[in-house]
Amino acid sequence: MAKKSVIARNEKRKALVEKYAAKREELKNAGDYEALSKLPRNSSATRVRNRCVLTGRGRGVYEKFGLCRHMFRKLALEGKIPGVKKASW
């Protein structure tokens, strides 16, 4: 389980990205890089980390499911992820 402060920081970044998305796009299209650099650093989409929605783990996250590899395997074996089953050939 990731620290609550790390998860909260990432959520705060997501909110900032959403808030400044239109303004960033407008400034990029205008080529005004001076004004773009004045915006908060955390309003850039590259600062947001994909995290597991259950554990907050930041590595080994399947973006399609929003789960880390550990939780994905656990839930898939329990049959709790629709359409996912163990491979057999």
From Swiss-Prot:
Keyword Ribonucleoprotein attributed: yes
Any Gene Ontology biological process: translation
Domain of life: Bacteria
Tagged with keyword Transport: no
InterPro entries per UniProt: Ribosomal_uS14, Ribosomal_uS14_bac/plastid, Ribosomal_uS14_CS, Ribosomal_uS14_sf
GO cellular component: cytoplasm; small ribosomal subunit
UniProtKB keywords: Ribonucleoprotein, Ribosomal protein, RNA-binding, rRNA-binding
GO molecular function, one term: rRNA binding
A Pfam family it matches: Ribosomal_S14
SUPFAM superfamilies: Glucocorticoid receptor-like (DNA-binding domain)
NCBIfam families: PRK08881.1
Membership in a protein family: Belongs to the universal ribosomal protein uS14 family.
Task performed by this protein: Binds 16S rRNA, required for the assembly of 30S particles and may also be responsible for determining the conformation of the 16S rRNA at the A site.
Subunit structure: Part of the 30S ribosomal subunit. Contacts proteins S3 and S10.
Name of the protein in its database record: Small ribosomal subunit protein uS14
Organism: Prosthecochloris aestuarii (strain DSM 271 / SK 413)
Name of the encoding gene: rpsN
